[in-house]
UniProtKB/Swiss-Prot annotation:
SS bonds (residue pairs): C58-C72, C65-C78, C69-C115, C71-C91
Protein name: Hainantoxin-XV-3
Keywords for the protein's UniProt record, in alphabetical order: Disulfide bond, Ion channel impairing toxin, Knottin, Secreted, Signal, Toxin
Free-text note regarding domains: The presence of a 'disulfide through disulfide knot' structurally defines this protein as a knottin.
Single GO term (MF): ion channel regulator activity
Prosegment location in residue numbers: 21-56
Family classification: Belongs to the neurotoxin 03 (Tx2) family. 02 subfamily. HNTX-XV sub-subfamily.
Compartments (UniProt record): Secreted
Function: Putative ion channel inhibitor.
Length: 117
């Protein structure tokens, strides 16, 4: 009985290893670039060299923007606000999930404290 379990387990390991190597080969083939793609990549690098002298900057928080890409920081978004009947887009730091969780905990604790009084 134990021998049968060992044989089945070893066969399952062999199948798992074989299937993972096939998946790695498929992934490697998908990642290979064609000649046209590498030529266009080379042209793009030449364009970057030409425009490399231009300074690239980002918009700081609470200044006007058009796209999320223009704002500084990973968690900064270009969010729309309505002021005096017209829309203004400003860069705002959303802070990510951790900040939202901590804010939720802080609100919960303050509500519990206010209920105790």
């Amino acid at each position: 009985m134990k021998l049968c379990a060992v044989i089945i387990a070893s066969l399952l390991v062999c199948v798992a290893v074989a299937s993972s190597s096939d998946n790695q080969k498929e992934f490697a083939q998908e990642k290979e670039m064609t000649r046209e793609e590498t030529q266009s990549l080379g042209e793009h690098e030449k364009d970057d060299e030409v425009t490399g002298s231009e300074e690239r900057s980002c918009i700081e928080e609470w200044k006007t923007c058009e796209n999320d890409c223009e704002c500084c920081g990973m968690s900064t978004l270009c969010a729309a606000s309505w002021v005096d009947g017209h829309e203004i887009k400003l860069c705002r730091n959303e802070g990510g999930k951790l900040k939202k969780v901590l804010h939720f905990i802080q609100k919960s604790v303050s509500k519990i404290r206010s209920c105790k009084k």
